[in-house]
Amino acid sequence: PRSRGLGDVYKRQMSVCWILTLLAVEYMLLHHDRLHEKGQYPEFFLIIGILTSYFDFLTYPITTLGIPLCCYFLLENDRAWNNIKKLIGFCASWGIGYAGMWAAKWVIADLTLHTGTIKDAIWSIIGRTEAIGGRPRMNGGFYVIGLNLHEYPVYMGIAAGILAAVAVGLMVMIIVMGRWKNVYAQLLPVVVTAAIPFAWIIAVQHHSALHARFTFRILSVAAAAAITFIVLIVRNVKKCQKN
């Protein structure tokens, strides 16, 4: 039946970013040493951004950046400033790939079809990023974050609350134990990564409000960052106990 066919297409489209994220993480786990030693991670994130832009129709693209970032900071340990520089560099690489592919599609379409695609694209960007309902940007951003959070069932909210409580509890524990200096360099980029989906929603709030039924999935980046945060603290505590 036609309706079933359309449903299958919708499901496939909704899974594009998740498939790309899983493929990216799997590739990192298999080839991390080579990527790290040859300094190829910027190119790796550039390619992820390009593929996301090419295959996805602005569903929850930021997951293809945030979750691989969490994976990277689980695999690598460096000084705080170096970690922040890497985080900024990887985000910039992904952003260049993502925005560059979108721009290339617009330019090629405009040059070949002469349909005014570039002008339409600019107006589309303005429309998708404008503040929702005439609110101030930050006020509207928090409102849209709430809309996206409401897309999750209650039990997911409870699970997220427990996850946050565990993370905060462990952080207090390592501060009391005097271990904060040993682990903060690893935790700092993870905390910044957790903020990425919220910054995305605030920046692209009109789109995120209009399509909250699928954009809410980008908040999985915050959950992944919280889990990474917990794993890094537990790993550090175990390491200190052995020493």
Spans of features found by a protein language model:
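Membrane-interfacial loop-to-transmembrane alpha-helix junctions, especially the N-terminal start
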Residues: 31-43, 83-90, 181-194
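Single conserved hydrophobic/aromatic residue that forms the stacking wall/gate
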Residues: 1-10
